[in-house]
């Protein structure tokens, strides 16, 4: 009737992501409860307000990060098979060719399926292939399985792409994806982890433009178990920690800040890809990302103002003398808390928000740049220091299995270069809560 009624839209309900808990909006006093001029990097106290967000209840585990690695590995292999198929088949359509299914085609019609006008247009202009040199313009076929067993190889051309060498119908010598058997221990078949690279780009909101594509090797550095400890026997951890099922639920380590950012980007892409396939016009999820330093401290406190540790008290043990976190209680004594290295990600009691190991186990990357005395100049609303690309140091929080109790305090700041990988640094991700979290109880995730 000529009234202003707004654009019709669906009612939006924020679904809690799997494995995450809601951290409600609130304010708190950021900084140490008992400032020490000698030890504290940020002795100034500052009251700040934080918008609600979801946070992983545990650190990202080896099992979860392996899902990322396997997806990237498969995409790299599919891409190489797609390129091989493109240049081998060219304009001659040979649907009976073993490599045909790996052709990068956008919405190719199946057998007996009536083509849409758009599919006809795509096929008329190059079989739906857009630009084989530009990965952003074509899609890989994820419906076809990759035969890994050598007895199941499709043909000699497929074998050449996977193992390396020249195929009978291929135009180039392929590098292959496996290390030669004579170069591996016990002639084991080992994938070339250097080839597992994730390509993505970010939107620069300050300059209002997309960044160039970044290519990042995402396999964890297992040699950190050697590098971090001189004259120390840690070979079993180097050999088994990331891939063995015994450590599946342990926090991933040996991951740089850049790799953690790539994981968060992939997690967003992976979820939204599922959302698009589920049904049309579905809302895409907010980006997964690393927490800011302020978000991390706010979540670690669990709603307890002025607490030194996530459990609230000033001590690292309970009334029975049991330690409340995985850390190094005494000089040279890593086992006093009954755990030598890392513990399972869901170990010890969670804090009042339901978050595990916000102190100890592994230190955690945050998104924030490190600046000494940051509390003196950051904003009071969702404070964060993004800084410039020249700042290579990122804030690390929480302390780890090899740290003394001081680093376990929720206010203690530490830092590391963003491209450095350590056997004691992991990460967890967050997702911004859309809308206001009104109507929730004070601690909606409290479990005891």
List the predicted regions and their residue ranges:
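Functional-site microenvironments in short loops/helix caps that host divalent-cation chemistry
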Residues: 22-23, 29, 34, 147, ...
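Short Gly/Pro-enriched turn/cap motifs at secondary-structure boundaries
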Residues: 11-12, 45, 252, 334-335, ...
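Short, structured beta-strand segments at or near domain termini in extracellular proteins/domains
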Residues: 423-439
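A short glycine-rich, aromatic-capped structural motif
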Residues: 13-89, 93-262, 268, 360
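Generic recognition of flexible, low-complexity loop/linker segments
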Residues: 9, 352, 415-417
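Bacterial Sec-dependent N-terminal signal peptides
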Residues: 1-5, 11, 17-18, 263, ...
